[in-house]
Amino acid sequence: MDVATDTTRRRLLPSDKNNAVVATRRPRTMEVSSRYRSPTPTKNGRCPSPSVTRPTVSSSSQSVAAKRAVSAERKRPSTPPSPTSPSTPIRDLSIDLPASSRRLSTGRLPESLWPSTMRSLSVSFQSDSVSVPVSKKERPVSSSSGDRTLRPSSNIAQKHKAETTSVSRKPTPERKRSPLKGKNNVSDLSENSKPVDGPHSRLIEQHRWPSRIGGKITSNSLNRSLDLGDKASRGIPTSGPGMGPSLRRMSLPLSSSSRPLHKTSSNTSSYGGLVSPTKSEDNNIARTSGAQRLLSAGSLDRATLATAVARLHPLPAPGSRPASPSRTSFLSSSSISRGMSTSRGVSPSRGLSPSRGLSPTRGLSPSRGLSPSRGTNTSCFARPSTPPSRGISPSRIRQTTTSTQSSTTTSVLSFITDVKKGKKASYIEDVHQLRLLHNRYLQWRFAIARAESVMYIQRLTSEETLFNVWHAISELQDHVTRQRIGLQQLKLEIKLNSLLNDQMVSLEDWATLERDHVSSLVGAISDLEANTLRLPATGGTKADTESLKAAMSSALDVMQAMGSSIWSLLSKVEEMNIMVTELAVVVTKESSMQGKCEDLLASTAIMQIEECSLRTHLIQTRREEGEDAETPPPLLPLSKFPWP
């Protein structure tokens, strides 16, 4: 697991700006063990922080000239320090160093020693977060504002007196930067600027390398490089609340010459909502009360940091290769402090912006979030036991996770070649623009998704409202239909009653005529009986023929008169019989017509309901056609309404 114990450190060259004369260097080796891991036994001692009590190395390690432990990646000249320049700007040595200096003492390349690091390089451009080449020079802060310029760290200030009196040599450059390294730790920057001599270096060494001595990490080790954090926090000029040029990541140098660092602090408020409350709180503390409160032992609780990392670390992107187990030990230190870089003067917007920081869509990808090369520059976090990864050239974006080890090696070497050819600035700018466009694309996607959700909710609300209106209209139509049916029935009953009332007068007249006819018949029958029974026919009756003739003649006259009257009544009776027969036929027809009328009334009610429904549907169809000509298509299709 501890690969750094077997590696050698590449030498660092002094900066041409402050250290023009290249001093002689003596090869030294240094062995670094993890601060938060149990120390593992090594075959030879390691080289501690610069002090006079540095242990000597074995003959096999001394035989390799200009080799040092790769974990620290710095070289110390033996020239005395200059009083006017306590530290030199950080310069990238990945371009100046030959390929042989990057080899180990065993002759193997770094990718053969760090397979997990090389594997993460091959997939760094395939995940949603793109790695940016970080080998660049440190830019000095603009001298426009005197109170915001970077000042040397507290360790440098404390050791300057010992340097000028005891040892006379130039200060070493502050932690050179190479493509294999990310942002340097603040502890490394202060360590490079310390002299070798002095009894106080042993105490600092004890705090810096606790795994070697066996001591515990105290609060002093958390406050070693606080002035550097103060420099970075005070070196950030505050501008207006707008984004302005802060989105273009002005702290990334695009040329070898140093340029002023212009960075607005409004990005902290703009992007502060994307980071966990712990990091936002620490960033505000660093801006108000300096770096003493930013990295103090009381402000950064390990449980809080672990919770923030667990909340900010997303799931790995599908298709990306999981990170090696050797990197998981320092996940919290490298991922939490990404937005708190202070040693290089990078503004908080670089660590907290959605394009590089811990945005919800990008987060900590396995190729970047688990790599210590993009970690923070705070001294309170332990150094990783494995060498940090380096970014891949953007021209190798098409590499897949199934690339072999040889293709990964070719990609890394091609990136170094491109850096030597001067293509790094354009690559950084292209990657930065790509991230800006990707962030804009994510913002648009979010806005479109939110608009679609709002429209979907509005459509559901409109559909529900239309359905409720349709239901109310249907109930109202049913009520109106029932009222119309009742009214039609009442009209038919009134018409039937009027017809029956006209027939009742004739029926009453028929009863009167029948009584008169019966009375006349009774009188005729009684007269005939009287005339027949009163004639004497037997018993020796004698009658006068003349008087009998006259009586018979009078009886015949009466009978003729009665016959004539009967014939007249008979004609009337026949006419009455005909009328009664016709009345019976009419009554029969009336009963049949009443049955048909009932059937027609029932069918009329059904047809009336269908007519009302069709008219309502026609009205709604015309309205929808009119709305289609003015507005977009209807939210609710017509087929959803179950019309009767």
Curated annotation (Swiss-Prot):
Q: Where is the composition biased (Polar residues)?
A: 31-43, 141-157, 184-193, 350-380
What is this protein's function?
Contributes to the assembly of the acentrosomal spindle and phragmoplast microtubule arrays as part of the augmin complex.
Which Pfam families does the entry link to? QWRF
* Keyword annotations of the record: Cell cycle, Cell division, Microtubule, Mitosis
Among InterPro entries, the record links this protein to: QWRF
Question: Protein name, please?
Answer: AUGMIN subunit 8
Task: Write down the species.
Answer: Arabidopsis thaliana (Mouse-ear cress)
Q: What residue spans carry the Basic and acidic residues bias annotation?
A: 197-208
Q: What happens when the gene is disrupted?
A: No visible phenotype.
Please give the subunit comment from the record: Part of the augmin complex composed of 8 subunits. The complex acts on microtubules and interacts with gamma-tubulin in spindles and the phragmoplast.
